[in-house]
Amino acid sequence: VTLPEADRPSWLFWILMGPCASGWLVAYGLAIYRAKLDKRVGIPVFVVEVNLAWEFTLSLILDQADVQRPINLSWFLVDCFILRQTLAYGWKDYPGMSRRAFRWMVFGVIAWSAVFHIMTTYELKDATGIYTGTGLNVFLSLSFIFMLNRRGSSLGQSMYVALAKGIGSFFAGWTVLVMYPGHHLFIFLFLTVWTIDATYCVLLYRKVREEGRSPWAWNRGPTEVPDAPGGLATGSAPRHGEREHEEAAVRSAASG
């Protein structure tokens, strides 16, 4: 269903779209920085694949407004850079899969998602991608929680990414609701996104505090040594049993 946009002043659109784009740009930039620091992807693997396919089809395949296509293309190029990091570090989230199989999975999901998006666009006559984009946002928000739970640590993540992503999604929701008022599905979906984003912020904050670190430390080191067995934290204090073992070894050496 192609939705007609509501009659609204252009300045209102840009007041909402500006913080939306800025929030997402900051989130992507900080996620890239965090991934380089921790050697783990800052954006969930499946989100990178599906989102890249979405931007690719909107930029280069599907019909778009002249003003919208360059914007979509810019985001597609950013996604390509994140894809590089995904191929370099993303396999670490799938220890039972070889790196070759992981690469096949990545490009397979991208191809499938692109075909799905094209077919959905024509089936629903969703020329602007508003339905698929809103649905993708729900999936994206959930994926951050799944990533945190899967790793069991804050590795590759930061409160600044979580907050920037939340701000971007908040203003994205209001942009859609202003452009297409009265559509209850959009209201439901964005209320879902905002709730999930807030939940992720709380869970991540608690996890970083649990690791004995400040959630707001800008240059906090990796929470664990990448690829290290057992995922011990870098610079973390030894556990109680380990400390007793070390003290016993010192006493034994001294008495010998």
Please tell me what each predicted stretch does.
Residues 1-256:
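Alpha-helical membrane-protein topology signature
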